[in-house]
Amino acid sequence: MSSIRLADLAQQLNAQLHGDGDIVITSIAPMHSANGEQITFLSDSRYRERLGECQAAAVVLQASDLPYCNIPALVVANPYLAYAYMAQIMDTTPIPAQDIHSSAVISPQATLGKNVAVGANAVIESGVVLGDNVVIGAGCFIGKNTRIGAGSRLWANVSVYHNVEMGEQCLIQSGAVIGSDGFGYANDRGKWVKIPQLGSVIIGDRVEIGACTTIDRGALDNTIIGNGVIIDNQCQIAHNVIIGDNTAVAGGVIMAGSLKIGCYCMIGGASVINGHMEICDKVTVTGMSMVMRPITEPGVYSSGIPAQPNKVWRKTAALVMNINEMNKRLKSMESKLEDENE
């Protein structure tokens, strides 16, 4: 949608309108740059003083911030959530494909639902089942016997290997690879012997997978991504990982094989998580953490050393390098004190 009346937007957001509802909104913008045709939002009351300088046509805010506002406003309980829905309403992103392109290679043994679109040079192999309103972008590869649920969209150059199952309303960004071989090898006197990965990948409904993320197929059982999971760009999900419903994974995360993560977790960017263990529900792992042991209690977990001035970091590193020697000296001193007190 390219434009909308403020009153109509208020109705769709279930917001209270204050001011002229006939104003036409053309787009959304940050508060500092919004102009007289754009709407903005205030999600943090600490910045309410910016309302006095705001040049937007209207603003979305909480009721407690309304007295500080001198332009038309939409009052909601959660402005940031309203912003998300507002962005969906006004989204002008083109879909990955409009129809079935003449250069697409589609097996006669594939089954396509109603209103399926397939972009240029995409390959759909035999046994594939695409649900209604599925969109496959240009250059995608969909391997044998894979099933993709209704309403799912794949942007250009996504590779989905054989026997993968993907639910409804999923969104897969360009360059993602789903169902590639897990890293499975046996050692025969120094020679690596490949173990064919005989499992697959099962993806639930409403899952989003970022650009250039890889999800390996299981060795014997399946790699499983639960409903509502969101995975950012350039993540590595190894074979037999299980991610519970509505967990969020930020960019650059590496998950080793056979890891099980619960529901409603949040994994910060560039974190590394060991395999063959379990993380319970409702765990937050902050960015760049290294998780080596199971987590059995909900909460926030962190590791690593935040950036410091180089001189400070060098001193800290020197202390860490010498900590064993310092510990020996401390124990020696304690022993001497005990002897003196006897």
UniProtKB/Swiss-Prot annotation:
GO terms for molecular function: N-acyltransferase activity; UDP-3-O-(R-3-hydroxymyristoyl)-glucosamine N-acyltransferase activity. It holds the Pfam family LpxD. Pathway: Glycolipid biosynthesis; lipid IV(A) biosynthesis; lipid IV(A) from (3R)-3-hydroxytetradecanoyl-[acyl-carrier-protein] and UDP-N-acetyl-alpha-D-glucosamine: step 3/6. It catalyses: a UDP-3-O-[(3R)-3-hydroxyacyl]-alpha-D-glucosamine + a (3R)-hydroxyacyl-[ACP] = a UDP-2-N,3-O-bis[(3R)-3-hydroxyacyl]-alpha-D-glucosamine + holo-[ACP] + H(+); UDP-3-O-[(3R)-3-hydroxytetradecanoyl]-alpha-D-glucosamine + (3R)-hydroxytetradecanoyl-[ACP] = UDP-2-N,3-O-bis[(3R)-3-hydroxytetradecanoyl]-alpha-D-glucosamine + holo-[ACP] + H(+). GO terms for cellular component: membrane. The active site is at 239 (proton acceptor). Its EC number is 2.3.1.191. It is an enzyme of class 2 (transferase). One of its GO terms (biological process) is lipid A biosynthetic process. Keywords: Acyltransferase, Lipid A biosynthesis, Lipid biosynthesis, Lipid metabolism, Repeat, Transferase. PROSITE patterns: HEXAPEP_TRANSFERASES (PS00101). InterPro entries: Hexapep (IPR001451), Hexapep_transf_CS (IPR018357), LpxD (IPR007691), Trimer_LpxA-like_sf (IPR011004), UDP_GlcNAc_AcTrfase_non-rep (IPR020573). Catalyzes the N-acylation of UDP-3-O-(hydroxytetradecanoyl)glucosamine using 3-hydroxytetradecanoyl-ACP as the acyl donor. Is involved in the biosynthesis of lipid A, a phosphorylated glycolipid that anchors the lipopolysaccharide to the outer membrane of the cell. Belongs to the transferase hexapeptide repeat family. LpxD subfamily. HAMAP family: LpxD (MF_00523). Homotrimer. This is UDP-3-O-(3-hydroxymyristoyl)glucosamine N-acyltransferase. It comes from Photorhabdus laumondii subsp. laumondii (strain DSM 15139 / CIP 105565 / TT01) (Photorhabdus luminescens subsp. laumondii). The lineage of its organism: Bacteria, Pseudomonadati, Pseudomonadota, Gammaproteobacteria, Enterobacterales.
